[in-house]
Amino acid sequence: TTALSKRKTAFCLGVIIFLASYPLFLEYMAIGHDLPFHLLRIDGIKAGLSQGVFPVKIQPVWAYDYGYATGVFYGDILLYFPALLRLMGFSVQSAYMTFVAVINLATTLISYFSFKKLFNSSRIGLIGSMLFTLSYYRMLNVYTRAAVGEYCAMMFLPLIFVGLYQILTMTEKKGWWKKAILPAIGL
């Protein structure tokens, strides 16, 4: 690939990321169905970290400061990023919006490289990335439902799919475990 086609690809990926993140540039933050719960999770992790607790399993800001074990029922690992932003002085809204932008970036790149690998075509990688990242269901999860766990999990679906495809289409059975790394990372 030439430098020009790499620049075109980078530009197209940037447009996809911008379109997926456009609602973040509005003057207000849309309140999704589950958003208050997840904002409290971010603040709970921040409070636990500021008290020197890691990993934060019982978040101290819940239940009138008695704490609640949301970290036992929900995977919190990706929410440590906005919690660290909170510790650096970001508002909870800014930390969450930055988190969503980073998830949109990661979803776009993971889906692009997965579709590119699967079809051996940069163009199909771009189309697949656009269709996946901007799909109605994913955007609904991000901005209407605020289903953090679901849209974070969706980020890894193309990676799981390409890894399983590689395992199932291998001609030689030796070294299958190397191909199993991609879907394992996605899970």
Question: Where in the sequence are the language-model features?
Answer:
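Active-site lumenal/periplasmic loops and adjacent helix-entry segments of GT-C-fold
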Residues: A20-L118, R123-F156, G163
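Membrane-interface helix-boundary signature
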Residues: S5-T9, Q93-F99, I160, K179
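Membrane-interface transmembrane helices that cradle and orient dolichyl/undecaprenyl
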Residues: I160-K179
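Short, intrinsically disordered, charge-balanced linker/junction segments flanking boundaries
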Residues: T2, W176-L187
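Membrane-interface helix-boundary motifs at transmembrane edges
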Residues: T2-L4, K116-N120, T169-G175
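Hydrophobic alpha-helical transmembrane segments
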Residues: A10-G14, T98, L126-M130, A180-A184
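Start-transfer (signal-anchor) and selected internal transmembrane alpha helices
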Residues: T1-L24
